[in-house]
């Protein structure tokens, strides 16, 4: 899967789950499970409930995503 295939959306973190997973509510109202991308994990970026984030979704599974950016 290339970078062109991903769907980027904005959302809000609802809660933190085990294993660095998060429940995120997208702007469209859907709730998904998302994990942190490698660069956020490497740089120790903390993600807390209530944070605005950018999520990448795969077109194959729209219920799971990857958090790629945390808004300031």
UniProtKB/Swiss-Prot annotation:
GO CC annotations on file: cytosol
Function: One of the essential components for the initiation of protein synthesis. Stabilizes the binding of IF-2 and IF-3 on the 30S subunit to which N-formylmethionyl-tRNA(fMet) subsequently binds. Helps modulate mRNA selection, yielding the 30S pre-initiation complex (PIC). Upon addition of the 50S ribosomal subunit IF-1, IF-2 and IF-3 are released leaving the mature 70S translation initiation complex.
Coarse class of the protein's main subcellular location: cytoplasm
Quaternary organization: Component of the 30S ribosomal translation pre-initiation complex which assembles on the 30S ribosome in the order IF-2 and IF-3, IF-1 and N-formylmethionyl-tRNA(fMet); mRNA recruitment can occur at any time during PIC assembly.
Annotated keywords: Cytoplasm, Initiation factor, Protein biosynthesis, RNA-binding, rRNA-binding
Protein name per its UniProtKB record: Translation initiation factor IF-1
Alphabetized Pfam families for the sequence: eIF-1a (PF01176)
GO MF annotations, alphabetized: ribosome binding; rRNA binding; translation initiation factor activity
Subcellular location: Cytoplasm
Stored HAMAP family: IF_1
Domain S1-like stretches: 1-72
Family statement: Belongs to the IF-1 family.
Organism of this sequence: Clostridium botulinum (strain Hall / ATCC 3502 / NCTC 13319 / Type A)
UniProt cross-references to NCBIfam families, sorted A to Z: infA
């Amino acid at each position: 899967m290339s970078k062109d295939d991903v769907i980027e959306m904005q959302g809000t973190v609802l809660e933190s789950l085990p294993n660095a997973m998060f429940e995120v509510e997208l702007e469209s109202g859907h709730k998904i499970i998302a994990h942190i991308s490698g660069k956020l994990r490497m740089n120790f970026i903390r993600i807390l409930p209530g944070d605005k984030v950018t999520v990448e979704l795969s077109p194959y599974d729209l219920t799971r995503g990857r958090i790629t950016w945390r808004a300031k």
